[in-house]
């Protein structure tokens, strides 16, 4: 299957490492042969990614199709204009990989993304391994993104000025 989840889940999360909160949106997962009537909903969900400060590109590290899925995500991000948004490549499901096989599987995962220069993090959402490293990468990316960004300034004028009409 190519995309598995069509619903977007959004939650606010406190990042102690950054001293601030962040909004996380979990968008579309992979399923194959998307029914034609769902294509528009699928695209609308993906366009939410264009507003992100950081994208967590989560890959099933135990999946034999991980390389194909990563390539498809990169293609779609480029198609929707989100290819320049900073990413963290997250290889999940370490708990499904036998400990003796982990070094080989992780090396293979890295080889599947040879051109990727974003941080790569290996985690198990199930048992929590690597999540502290992931949180730190997210905090670092947000801090560097926000430190270099010009924050919008608010005008001291009201939205409606009774003397001059609408502001």
Model regions: which residues?
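Short flexible coil/turn linkers enriched for glycine and charged/polar residues
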Residues: 15-21, 51, 83
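Inter-motif core of Ras-like GTPase G domains
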Residues: 37-63, 75-82, 124
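C-terminal-of-GTPase-core extension/linker across diverse P-loop GTPases
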Residues: 4, 18, 64-167
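Generic enzyme active-site microenvironment
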Residues: 24, 58, 90-93
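Switch II (G3) loop of P-loop NTPases
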Residues: 1-9, 16-44, 61-64
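Short acidic (Asp/Glu) and glycine-rich catalytic loops that position anionic groups and cofactors
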Residues: 25, 51-55, 114-118
